[in-house]
Amino acid sequence: MLDIKFVRSNPELVLEGLKKRGSDISLDEFLKLDSMRREKLVVAEQLKNTRNVVSQEIGKLKKAGQDAEEKTLEMRKVSQKIKDMDDEIRNIEEKLQEILLSIPNIPHESVPVGKDENDNVEIRRWGKPRGFEFEPKPHWDLGEDLNILDFERGGKVTGARFSFYKGMGARLERALINFMLDLHTREHGYTEIFPPFIVNGDSMLGTGQLPKFAEDMFKLEGLNYYLIPTAEVPVTNLYRDEILAEEQLPIYHCAYSACFRAEAGAAGRDTRGLIRQHQFNKVELVKFSKPEESFDELERLTANAEKILQALGLPYRVVLLSTGDMGFTSAKTYDLEVWLPSYNAYKEISSCSNFLDFQARRANIKYRPTPKSKPEFVHTLNGSGIAVGRALSAILENYQEADGSITVPPVLVPYMGGIERITL
């Protein structure tokens, strides 16, 4: 959420940022309501001053043994006016809050302006896509042929975009999770968190999923509870409504979780395989930093996610998202895209974003720069470190052999109990 004072003082700057995103949100209603609120606050303050004066006059009259009924009646009328005015102000503030919650973050000046993913800018590549001497299979065929993935029974038991991992498939998924957590905690300084997979509405509001993206969430019927779409939600909200000490920052957390997404807008996209599931596993990286350090932290976070792909030997590229492709809450985002032979293209496997104080303001997460200073909002960042199912897909496709077997990446062999090859 943007600072109300910033929007009030810089409407042209906010509108320019919205225009870069391709948003047609108008600030007219916001500015009108904000002006109305400030006018009513002045009137309310005047009425409260009047009430104080009348109250003092009543006290003097009673002390002197004189009739104070007229003044008492006057104070009741003033008190009612104050109540009515406070109610009006509260209603206006609710409308202002609703508008502020609907406004996306303002893109950082370093973000390329564009309409969509076609305007993203490639920053760098790592590794070279493998040249196969045979026709490579897609991961869904490989998984079913090896009896380690079962999409048909996933559909039977639950529905479309659900799957079973079996045998070596389940073991490889678990190996990836443990490897990622070990690398981030041992080499990158993250503290592991194992969060709840169900959160309340306030948590979803804090990280920006609500109210705008309610249709993409799985909500528990009749309850103010949601299945998490990413561990970003519970881990960021870990410090909701708290004031951190300056020496605590930066805070690095990593978390494994299952993720649940309705994917309401993804009909017809990536219908086969593990690329777009309603339930999938992910290791998430979350940071809380001082404002002046957040962009340096974004570069480090992105490098941390890249390290996973490098260790797995998977070719990938880093792209800087354009204003038209960025998420609602982000001020700047890098996507890591892994090479998938079945698509003959790079596919997203991680998004690393700096939200500035956008989430912290919604979730009320602050820090105190000095022991006696006024609390300020922290900056929050997160990124996938990385999406586990997509990593498994990339391993199956990039490490497949002509006989249909899969070579296990060397770094995962210890996590697989010494198994170096997955065969039928």
From Swiss-Prot:
<dbReference type="GO" id="GO:0016260">
    <property type="term" value="P:selenocysteine biosynthetic process"/>
</dbReference>
<feature type="binding site">
    <location>
        <position position="284"/>
    </location>
    <ligand>
        <name>L-serine</name>
    </ligand>
</feature>
<dbReference type="InterPro" id="IPR033729">
    <property type="entry name" value="SerRS_core"/>
</dbReference>
<feature type="binding site">
    <location>
        <position position="384"/>
    </location>
    <ligand>
        <name>L-serine</name>
    </ligand>
</feature>
<dbReference type="GO" id="GO:0140096">
    <property type="term" value="F:catalytic activity, acting on a protein"/>
</dbReference>
<keyword id="KW-0963">Cytoplasm</keyword>
<comment type="pathway">
    <text>Aminoacyl-tRNA biosynthesis; selenocysteinyl-tRNA(Sec) biosynthesis; L-seryl-tRNA(Sec) from L-serine and tRNA(Sec): step 1/1.</text>
</comment>
<keyword id="KW-0547">Nucleotide-binding</keyword>
<keyword id="KW-0436">Ligase</keyword>
<dbReference type="GO" id="GO:0005524">
    <property type="term" value="F:ATP binding"/>
</dbReference>
<dbReference type="GO" id="GO:0005737">
    <property type="term" value="C:cytoplasm"/>
</dbReference>
<dbReference type="InterPro" id="IPR010978">
    <property type="entry name" value="tRNA-bd_arm"/>
</dbReference>
<comment type="function">
    <text>Catalyzes the attachment of serine to tRNA(Ser). Is also able to aminoacylate tRNA(Sec) with serine, to form the misacylated tRNA L-seryl-tRNA(Sec), which will be further converted into selenocysteinyl-tRNA(Sec).</text>
</comment>
<protein>
    <recommendedName>
        <fullName>Serine--tRNA ligase</fullName>
        <ecNumber>6.1.1.11</ecNumber>
    </recommendedName>
</protein>
<comment type="subunit">
    <text>Homodimer. The tRNA molecule binds across the dimer.</text>
</comment>
<feature type="binding site">
    <location>
        <begin position="348"/>
        <end position="351"/>
    </location>
    <ligand>
        <name>ATP</name>
    </ligand>
</feature>
<feature type="binding site">
    <location>
        <begin position="230"/>
        <end position="232"/>
    </location>
    <ligand>
        <name>L-serine</name>
    </ligand>
</feature>
<dbReference type="GO" id="GO:0006434">
    <property type="term" value="P:seryl-tRNA aminoacylation"/>
</dbReference>
<comment type="similarity">
    <text>Belongs to the class-II aminoacyl-tRNA synthetase family. Type-1 seryl-tRNA synthetase subfamily.</text>
</comment>
<dbReference type="InterPro" id="IPR006195">
    <property type="entry name" value="aa-tRNA-synth_II"/>
</dbReference>
<feature type="binding site">
    <location>
        <begin position="261"/>
        <end position="263"/>
    </location>
    <ligand>
        <name>ATP</name>
    </ligand>
</feature>
<dbReference type="Pfam" id="PF00587">
    <property type="entry name" value="tRNA-synt_2b"/>
</dbReference>
<keyword id="KW-0030">Aminoacyl-tRNA synthetase</keyword>
<dbReference type="InterPro" id="IPR002314">
    <property type="entry name" value="aa-tRNA-synt_IIb"/>
</dbReference>
<dbReference type="InterPro" id="IPR015866">
    <property type="entry name" value="Ser-tRNA-synth_1_N"/>
</dbReference>
<keyword id="KW-0067">ATP-binding</keyword>
<dbReference type="Pfam" id="PF02403">
    <property type="entry name" value="Seryl_tRNA_N"/>
</dbReference>
<dbReference type="GO" id="GO:0004828">
    <property type="term" value="F:serine-tRNA ligase activity"/>
</dbReference>
<dbReference type="InterPro" id="IPR002317">
    <property type="entry name" value="Ser-tRNA-ligase_type_1"/>
</dbReference>
<dbReference type="InterPro" id="IPR042103">
    <property type="entry name" value="SerRS_1_N_sf"/>
</dbReference>
<dbReference type="InterPro" id="IPR045864">
    <property type="entry name" value="aa-tRNA-synth_II/BPL/LPL"/>
</dbReference>
<keyword id="KW-0648">Protein biosynthesis</keyword>
<dbReference type="GO" id="GO:0016740">
    <property type="term" value="F:transferase activity"/>
</dbReference>
